[in-house]
Amino acid sequence: MYRIYDCLANQHDIVLVIIALLIGLAGIHTAFNMYARACIGRLRQKVAWLFLTGVVTGGSIWATHFIAMLSYDPVVPVGYEPVLTAVSLLIAIAATTAGFAIASVIGPNLLLSRIVGGLVVGLGISAMHFTGMSAIRVPGVISWHMDIVIGAILMGAVFGMISLWLARSAQTERQKLLGKAN
């Protein structure tokens, strides 16, 4: 645990970390509001809102992650392989779109759909993270601590499930308000 704290406290530009955090929070707020629209209306509207929710969610998660990566100072020159970097963005968008779709379309009132949808989001974010990290090019070797890798994947899965549960559970009042506005 100290390795993670030390890395964050001493090897990251705090201003960029704060910017990344603000982008993440704005993205989540926007995504939850868009997801509320995806849960009401006709099928064609739902599909469009789910796609847009996935693009906004995946894009903001990716931007948060990439800005945080840029804030890291490993004290050696760093580059990023463009194809893997772009693939990591596509993974984030695809996973969040699929996760939100599963949570809303398969059965919006079923606990299982929220859990599976959240699991897809969480594991997709983990895949985006490790794909993005694989895009890093440095004059040296990057090594992975498997305990941290496994912990990150498990945390991503759990937080994904919690996030989708909260996003869907919070829809009741928003749906009423949005329904009145339509």
Provide a role label for each language-model segment.
Residues M1-N182:
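Alpha-helical transmembrane segments and their helix-helix packing motifs
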